[in-house]
């Protein structure tokens, strides 16, 4: 007796919540929500706008540092090797390259947003 009542109640409640979730967003129409927006650029504008070289350099810098971090991720598993001194030397070299690259970008004002 309780099983049919529980099933009916849960199905009714589910259908009610799905109906409310379907109809409620249609009552509030936001113009910003339906306007196209691509990475801070207006996609409906001209395709020949000059591209900011600053965005490109920051993206390349991010990719390089991300690649170096990806090379450092397996180091905890590499610490189980027999040649621990070589693993620590390679890790130190990778971290030194990462720090030198960061210092170079900082000194060249590559991380500055305001010109």
Curated annotation (Swiss-Prot):
* Topology versus the membrane: Multi-pass membrane protein
Please tell me which top-level EC class this enzyme sits in: translocase
Which spans are transmembrane here?
3-23, 55-75, 86-106
Cross-referenced InterPro entries, in alphabetical order? NADH_UbQ/plastoQ_OxRdtase_su3 (IPR000440), NDAH_ubi_oxred_su3_sf (IPR038430)
Give the chief site where it resides: mitochondrion
Q: Name one GO biological process term.
A: mitochondrial electron transport, NADH to ubiquinone
Q: Which GO terms describe its cellular component?
A: mitochondrial inner membrane; NADH dehydrogenase complex
Gene3D superfamilies listed in its UniProt record: NADH:ubiquinone/plastoquinone oxidoreductase, chain 3
Claim: Ion transport is one of the keywords in the record: no
Identify the Pfam families for this entry. Answer: Oxidored_q4
What reaction gets catalysed by this protein?
a ubiquinone + NADH + 5 H(+)(in) = a ubiquinol + NAD(+) + 4 H(+)(out)
EC number assigned by the record: 7.1.1.2
The answer to keyword Transmembrane applying to this record is yes
Protein keywords: Electron transport, Membrane, Mitochondrion, Mitochondrion inner membrane, NAD, Respiratory chain, Translocase, Transmembrane, Transmembrane helix, Transport, Ubiquinone
- Name its cellular compartments: Mitochondrion inner membrane
Query: Tell me, what is one Gene Ontology molecular-function annotation carried by this entry?
Result: NADH dehydrogenase (ubiquinone) activity
Origin, by domain of life? Answer: Eukaryota
Report the sequence similarity comment from the record: Belongs to the complex I subunit 3 family.
Its annotated function is as follows: Core subunit of the mitochondrial membrane respiratory chain NADH dehydrogenase (Complex I) which catalyzes electron transfer from NADH through the respiratory chain, using ubiquinone as an electron acceptor. Essential for the catalytic activity of complex I.
The record's note on quaternary structure and interaction partners says: Core subunit of respiratory chain NADH dehydrogenase (Complex I) which is composed of 45 different subunits. Interacts with TMEM186. Interacts with TMEM242.
Protein name, per record: NADH-ubiquinone oxidoreductase chain 3
What gene makes this protein? MT-ND3
């Amino acid at each position: 007796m309780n099983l049919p009542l529980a099933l009916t109640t849960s199905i009714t409640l589910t259908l009610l919540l799905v109906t409310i979730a379907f109809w409620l967003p249609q009552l509030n129409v936001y113009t910003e929500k339906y306007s196209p927006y691509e990475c801070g650029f207006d996609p409906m504008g001209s395709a020949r706008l000059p591209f900011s070289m600053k965005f490109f350099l920051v993206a390349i810098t991010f990719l390089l540092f991300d690649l170096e971090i990806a090379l450092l991720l397996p180091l905890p598993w590499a610490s189980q090797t027999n040649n621990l001194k070589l693993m620590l030397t390679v890790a130190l070299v990778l971290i030194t390259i990462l720090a030198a690259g960061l210092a170079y970008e900082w000194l060249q004002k590559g991380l500055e947003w305001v010109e």
